[in-house]
């Protein structure tokens, strides 16, 4: 039983912040940011724009393109690390788009979340459990940024991307590999940092509260540049496809220096990498489906082409998927 990508969709907040605007709050410049990250601007969600709203807009975009009603969806998987509700926002997304017949749950894996969610969805279809599955990668990382931290506040943007997949005799997903190394988890974290507590005799019970995102940029860079080319090569070897046979690479949009270094290690031209960093920044779980949707809109990806998706992020987690575009 095959898995076919039926459509894609995306959404970003209307409000955006350009590099020059950071000069008013931290010691930086447009030149410093753009040369080190490849980012020119990023879209940020105001208080009136929820994670669920962005995810629903991307989902409805994908459903509209496939001419499929929300009631026909069997399963919704929302990849996010920034839900509106700590218990998860997939059920809120289900209600928002009217997918009343579907099961819905969240996957939390930061910037690798979409890759893991798409693999999970494909396995449900191949097992015969579900027919149509909506996968959404969405994050509002701006909610968790320390705006005085120059190393991280310039990187992140908010957004959502969606992919609708279904059962088919044609198989779009040729292979995948997923990896985790929890020993490296301290390099990228958003930790519970209690500021209050309740005392029960001699025992203190802390009250939950999360801190801002903390990242060791040098270690994340070394990790991504070393591990991502390996997982891509291994994934391609498993399906007997060479690097030269790949038409497009869509990697998590972390920063341009990571993408350039990975391209060098894979011995591929940077022109084979689809990037949208300049306009969106690092949108975490949304970055890959957002870039995929734009590439399809721009008619870069054509039927019959081989596309590699690869994500990497907190955990530390990473993975790759090989697609044959149909």
UniProtKB/Swiss-Prot annotation:
The keyword Repeat is annotated on this UniProt entry: no
Alphabetized Pfam families for the sequence: ACP_syn_III, ACP_syn_III_C
GO cellular component: chloroplast
Catalytic activity: malonyl-[ACP] + acetyl-CoA + H(+) = 3-oxobutanoyl-[ACP] + CO2 + CoA
Pathway membership, UniProt: Lipid metabolism; fatty acid biosynthesis
Acyltransferase is among the record's keywords: yes
Record localization: Plastid, Chloroplast
InterPro entries named in the record: ACP_syn_III_C, ACP_syn_III_N, FabH, Thiolase-like
Active site residues of this protein: 111, 252, 282
Residues forming coiled coils: none
Chief location category: plastid
SUBUNIT field: Homodimer.
Function per UniProt: Catalyzes the condensation reaction of fatty acid synthesis by the addition to an acyl acceptor of two carbons from malonyl-ACP. Catalyzes the first condensation reaction which initiates fatty acid synthesis and may therefore play a role in governing the total rate of fatty acid production. Possesses both acetoacetyl-ACP synthase and acetyl transacylase activities. Its substrate specificity determines the biosynthesis of branched-chain and/or straight-chain of fatty acids.
Domain notes: The last Arg residue of the ACP-binding site is essential for the weak association between ACP/AcpP and FabH.
Family stated for the protein in its record: Belongs to the thiolase-like superfamily. FabH family.
Name the record gives this protein: Beta-ketoacyl-[acyl-carrier-protein] synthase III
Organism: Porphyra purpurea
């Amino acid at each position: 039983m095959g898995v076919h990508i039926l459509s894609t969709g995306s959404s970003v907040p209307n409000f955006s912040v350009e590099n020059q605007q950071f000069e008013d709050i931290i010691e930086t410049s447009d030149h410093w940011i753009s040369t080190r990250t490849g980012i020119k601007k990023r879209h940020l969600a105001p208080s009136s724009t929820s994670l669920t709203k962005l995810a629903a807009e991307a989902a409805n975009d994908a459903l509209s393109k496939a001419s499929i009603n929300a009631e026909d969806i069997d399963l919704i998987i929302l990849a996010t690390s920034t839900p509106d509700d700590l218990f998860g926002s997939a059920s809120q997304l289900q209600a928002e788009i009217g997918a009343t017949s579907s099961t819905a749950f969240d996957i939390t894996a930061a910037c690798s979340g979409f890759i893991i969610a798409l693999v999970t969805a494909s396995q449900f279809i191949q097992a015969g459990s579900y027919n149509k599955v909506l996968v959404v990668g969405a994050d509002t990382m701006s909610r968790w940024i320390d705006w005085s931290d120059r190393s991280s506040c310039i990187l992140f943007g908010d957004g959502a991307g969606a992919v609708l997949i279904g059962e088919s005799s044609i198989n779009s997903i040729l292979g995948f590999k997923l990896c985790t190394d929890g020993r490296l988890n301290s390099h990228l974290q958003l930790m519970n940092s209690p500021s209050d507590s309740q005392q029960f005799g001699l025992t203190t019970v802390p009250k939950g509260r999360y801190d801002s995102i903390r990242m060791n940029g040098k270690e994340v860079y070394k990790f991504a540049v070393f591990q991502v080319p390996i997982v891509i090569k291994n994934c391609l070897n498993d399906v007997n496809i060479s690097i030269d046979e790949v038409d497009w690479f869509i990697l998590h949009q972390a920063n341009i220096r990571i993408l350039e270094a990975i391209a060098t290690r894979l011995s591929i031209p940077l022109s084979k990498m689809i990037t949208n960093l300049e306009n969106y920044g690092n949108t975490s779980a949304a970055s890959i489906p957002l870039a995929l949707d734009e590439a399809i809109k721009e008619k870069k990806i054509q039927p019959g082409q081989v596309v590699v998706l690869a994500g990497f992020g907190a955990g530390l987690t990473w993975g790759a998927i090989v697609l044959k575009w149909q």
